[in-house]
Amino acid sequence: MQRGREREAESQRVRESERQRGREAERQRERQRGREAERQRGRERGREAEREAERQRGRERQRGRGEAERQRGRERGREVERHRRGREAERQRGREREAERQRGREAEREAERQRERQRERQRGREAERQRGREAERQRGREAEKQRGERQRGREVEAEAEGRGRGMRQEAEATEQGQGQRQRQR
């Protein structure tokens, strides 16, 4: 009976020990699973972090490309603006050259008008001198004619005077002749 109890107690201890080992092994497995799960989660987090970093790099690259594209766009814009300003400056220079030519033509026309007025005045003065000379000649002819007329008048007068003297002398001679004849008679 005593041995039966001991065997029972032994059996009890064995079972207890077995259960204890089982529980220990279970806890061990549990811890193992926990560690494994933790490692899994760590790996997962690592992969997620890697993916996030890749996405970040992708976004960075995208932004970089976008920025580079914008930079190129700005550069093209500036280039277009330079060309536009160049063309505008060229047109402006063309307009200035045209205005310069216009001013030149205008100045030439003005100079021509000036020369024409000068020639006109010259012709006027020439005509005036011509008229003066003509009037002078006319006055000369007129004076000449008047002198001629006065000369002829004097000649006629002298002639008349001469005839008058001749007739008086003749009359006197006649009177004297008659007187002598009367005295002789």
Curated annotation (Swiss-Prot):
Top-rank taxon: Eukaryota
GO (cellular component) term, any one: cytoplasm
Keywords: Repeat
Region annotation (15 X 8 AA tandem repeats of [QR]-R-[GVE]-R-[EQ]-[RSAV]-[EGQ]-[RAK]) ranges: 2-158
Biased composition (Basic and acidic residues): 1-171
Compositionally biased region (Low complexity): 174-185
Each Sequence repeat, start to end: 2-9, 12-19, 20-27, 32-39, 40-47, 56-63, 71-78, 84-91, 92-99, 102-109, 114-121, 122-129, 130-137, 138-145, 151-158
Region Disordered, annotated ranges: 1-185
Leader sequence residues: none
Protein name: Octapeptide-repeat protein T2
Taxon lineage: Eukaryota, Metazoa, Chordata, Craniata, Vertebrata
